């Protein structure tokens, strides 16, 4: 009688161990488990995120026909994904500055306050970086007026 029960009990034990070790087992209620290799939240203070943001803003300004530079007003969300390099996903509120494009230093440019010159945009940037090879590319960029 012990023989016929052994196989189902063994399968049940294997299933219990597999469930206990699955990524979903450690997830908090109401939160989806983080996938290995999937995007994860990143801090704007991280050096890689800062470099990706600077690169995205530079590319945004190169592609813009505006006579004024724009810069980040606020980083709404920053995520990163480790692949053969790093994908950065940045949601950024951009603002038009008082500096024209022939002025090189964008860091200290104030934002326009005059209503007819003030302009904001909400942008989502995807930047691919391979830091050890010095590679950084803007994979995707979408913006809409805010």
From Swiss-Prot:
SMART domains associated with the record: CY
Localization in the cell: Secreted
Signal peptide: 1-26
UniProtKB keywords: Amyloid, Disulfide bond, Phosphoprotein, Protease inhibitor, Secreted, Signal, Thiol protease inhibitor
Top-rank taxon, per record: Eukaryota
GO terms for cellular component: cytoplasm; extracellular space; vesicle
Cystine pairs: 99-109, 123-143
Keyword Signal found: yes
Modified residues (Phosphoserine): 43
Site (Reactive site): 37
GO terms, molecular function: cysteine-type endopeptidase inhibitor activity
Glycosyltransferase keyword on record: no
InterPro entries: Cystatin_dom (IPR000010), Cystatin_sf (IPR046350), Prot_inh_cystat_CS (IPR018073)
UniProt-listed CDD domains: CY
Pfam families linked to this entry: Cystatin
Motif stretch (Secondary area of contact): 81-85
Role of this protein: As an inhibitor of cysteine proteinases, this protein is thought to serve an important physiological role as a local regulator of this enzyme activity.
Family as reported in the entry's similarity comment: Belongs to the cystatin family.
PANTHER family linked: CYSTATIN, CYSTATIN-C
Full protein name: Cystatin-C
Species this protein is from: Saimiri sciureus (Common squirrel monkey)
Gene: CST3
């Amino acid at each position: 009688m012990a023989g016929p029960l052994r196989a189902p009990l063994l399968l049940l034990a294997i299933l219990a161990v597999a469930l206990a070790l699955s990524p979903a087992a450690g997830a908090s209620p109401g939160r989806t488990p983080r996938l290995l290799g999937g995007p994860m939240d990143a801090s704007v203070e991280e050096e890689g995120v800062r470099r990706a943001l600077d690169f995205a803003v530079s590319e945004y300004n190169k592609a813009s026909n505006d006579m004024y530079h724009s810069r980040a007003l606020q980083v709404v969300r920053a995520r990163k994904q480790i692949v053969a390099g790093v994908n950065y996903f940045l949601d950024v509120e951009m603002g038009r500055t008082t500096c024209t494009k022939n002025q090189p230093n964008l860091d200290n440019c104030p934002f326009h306050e005059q209503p007819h010159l003030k302009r904001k945009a909400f942008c989502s940037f995807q930047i691919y970086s391979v830091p050890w090879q010095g590679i950084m590319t803007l994979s995707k960029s979408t913006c809409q007026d805010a």
